[in-house]
């Protein structure tokens, strides 16, 4: 990849697959969405496509990275949050308003990243239930298989 016409990074073809981290989504991708939605909220519940992607992620030779709550199918939004002083907090708010201005026609504005409630809403404990347990068991079984195969 390039930035400003200059190459970035280093060649990596000589590195083994386990030198790389593989994820389906992470805090940057989810937190930088205005709505903070995760893949589990963007796809139909129990989606075969999501289950297949998880299997590919966990059974590939790369190091799997699970995003917070992914292992139990969390559908809670994960919002961008900060704890900046007043001046920087205002600049971040203004920057995010500009960033999302063109795409916020039919949805609520993103929550204030510096509001402590935004942090609390992004870090919920999973609600109990059979669906959460089923996701957890799916991950557990794939990780057992991974340990056996790799």
Model-derived regions: residue spans:
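Loop/helix patches that line or flank the sugar-binding groove of alpha-linked glycan CAZymes
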Residues: 2-7, 12-150
């Amino acid at each position: 990849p390039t930035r400003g016409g200059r190459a970035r990074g280093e060649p990596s073809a000589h590195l083994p697959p386990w030198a790389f981290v593989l994820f389906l989504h992470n805090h940057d991708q989810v937190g930088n969405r205005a709505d903070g939605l995760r893949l589990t909220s963007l796809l139909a519940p129990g989606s075969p496509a999501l289950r297949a992607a998880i299997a590919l992620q966990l059974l590939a030779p790369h190091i799997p990275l699970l995003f917070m709550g992914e292992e139990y199918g969390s559908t809670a939004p994960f919002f961008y949050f900060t704890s900046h002083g007043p001046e920087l907090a205002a600049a971040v708010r203004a920057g995010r308003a500009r960033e999302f201005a063109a795409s916020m026609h039919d949805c609520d504005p993103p929550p204030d990243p510096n509001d402590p409630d935004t942090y609390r809403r992004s870090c919920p404990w999973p609600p109990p239930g059979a669906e959460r347990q089923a996701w957890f068991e799916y991950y557990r079984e794939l990780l057992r298989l991974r340990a056996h195969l790799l």
